[in-house]
Amino acid sequence: MVTKYTSPVNAYRLFKLLPILFLIIWVADSGDYQTKVYTRAILAGLCFSIVGDFLLLFPTQFKSGLFSFLTGHIWYMVAFISCDWSVPILPTIIIIILAMGMISQLYSTSGKLKIPVLVYITVIAGMGITAFGRLEAIQSTPAIIGAMGATLFMISDCILGWNKFKKPFHLAEGIILLTYYSGQWMIAFSTMK
């Protein structure tokens, strides 16, 4: 009975969820979520992220986890466009080129997940563009931190996609977790004044 709850697999699952849980609690406690759409949308994105993290712990739930993260990215986009916003020309061009590159590399190797992967890459690119649009309009420290967080999240997802659908590589898991948690922390921190 004790082994069931203290096995390395269950410990890994617990520790994988804790950082995002702490961010949810921190933003709910510290952020101005009652009056600011931005903070409420980031909080919603974090909640969908922790659900996605949980689902991705089970290989059979990859599509559900992908959908949960996709929903989280949409909430982040809502947050980024809820403030002043401007079209960020150069970041948009760069992100679109990178997204098209990822689609061209992963589309043929993603099997039955071709359409979900295509939609997911499109949405995460949109999340990055909206984060830089907020930065373009506001040019504040929280906007810089939010754009940096979105960039790290995009990097994390690109490495995850490459590792899963194209070619697994040795350090992928560590790099994915480092960029993912750093990105989420920065996005959460962007709610602070």
Q: Each predicted region: which residue ranges?
A:
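Polytopic alpha-helical membrane-helix bundles and their juxtamembrane interface segments
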Residues: 1-193
